C-alpha cells in the first residue's frame, strides 16, 4: 500500500517517533539519539525516507521508513509477549528489543550528507520493476546494517551485544552474512540470546 502523506502528517509521524524514543531510552543514550534524529542531523531524512525502493517491498513511499520501524517495534514487542506468555525465556530487556527494532534499518537514512534512496528517474524501472526509489550513487557503498552501525558510532551511541545481534540479524536467513549465526552445529558458536528470534 502506498501512502501519500502531507507535510503535516510527515511531521506528526516524526514527532510520534521522537516521543517513542523518549519513552524507551534515558540519560546520555537518549541525548545522543535525540541529537542524531534532530532536524539538523538525520531528522529530515528520518521523516521523509521510504523503507524500501520497490512497490512489492515494505513501505515504499515518502515517510515509509518511520511507519516500517514503528511496525517492527510494535510487532517485536507483541511477539516477545507471546513468547513469554508461552513459557519462553526472555533473556533481553525491552530496551534492547526496542533499540534493535528502531535501528535495524538505520542505514537507509544515508550518511548524514546524502540520502540512501533517491526518486527513481527511469520510467521503465517504475513501470516494469515497480521501482520508485533508487539507491543513491553518491553514497559510499555499505550494506544497510553496516551503515547502521557506522551511523550509531558516528553519533557516539553505544549498544549492547544483544542489540548488535538483533540489528545484524534482522533480515534472518535472507542475508548471507548472518547464516553463520543462525546455522551452527557446534554448541560453542550458537546464539546465546533469543533477541533476534
Task: Report residues per predicted region.
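Divalent metal-dependent catalytic cores for phosphoryl transfer on phosphate-bearing substrates
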Residues: 53-63, 67, 74, 79, ...
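Non-catalytic interface/linker regions that flank or bridge core catalytic/transmembrane domains
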Residues: 1-50
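Generic structural signal for well-ordered, non-membrane alpha-helical segments
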Residues: 10-13, 65, 69
Amino acid at each position: 500500500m502506498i501512502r501519500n502523506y502531507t507535510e503535516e502528517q510527515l511531521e506528526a509521524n516524526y514527532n510520534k517517533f521522537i516521543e517513542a524514543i523518549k519513552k524507551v531510552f534515558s540519560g546520555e543514550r537518549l541525548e545522543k539519539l535525540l541529537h542524531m534524529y534532530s532536524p539538523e542531523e538525520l531528522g529530515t531524512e528520518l521523516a521523509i525516507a521510504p523503507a524500501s525502493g520497490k512497490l512489492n517491498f515494505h513501505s515504499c513511499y515518502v515517510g515509509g521508513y518511520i511507519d516500517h520501524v514503528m511496525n517492527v517495534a510494535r510487532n517485536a514487542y507483541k511477539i516477545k509477549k507471546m513468547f513469554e506468555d508461552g513459557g519462553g525465556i526472555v533473556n533481553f530487556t525491552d530496551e534492547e528489543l526496542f533499540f534493535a527494532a528502531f535501528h535495524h534499518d538505520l542505514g537507509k537514512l544515508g550518511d548524514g550528507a546524502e540520502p540512501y534512496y533517491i526518486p527513481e528517474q527511469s520510467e521503465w524501472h517504475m513501470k516494469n520493476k515497480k521501482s520508485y526509489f533508487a539507491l543513491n550513487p553518491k553514497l559510499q557503498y555499505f550494506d544497510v546494517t553496516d551503515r547502521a552501525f557506522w551511523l550509531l558510532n558516528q553519533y557516539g551511541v553505544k549498544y549492547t551485544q544483544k542489540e548488535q545481534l538483533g540489528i545484524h540479524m534482522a533480515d534472518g536467513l535472507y542475508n548471507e552474512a548472518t547464516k553463520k549465526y543462525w546455522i551452527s552445529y557446534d554448541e560453542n558458536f550458537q546464539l546465546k540470546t533469543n533477541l533476534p528470534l
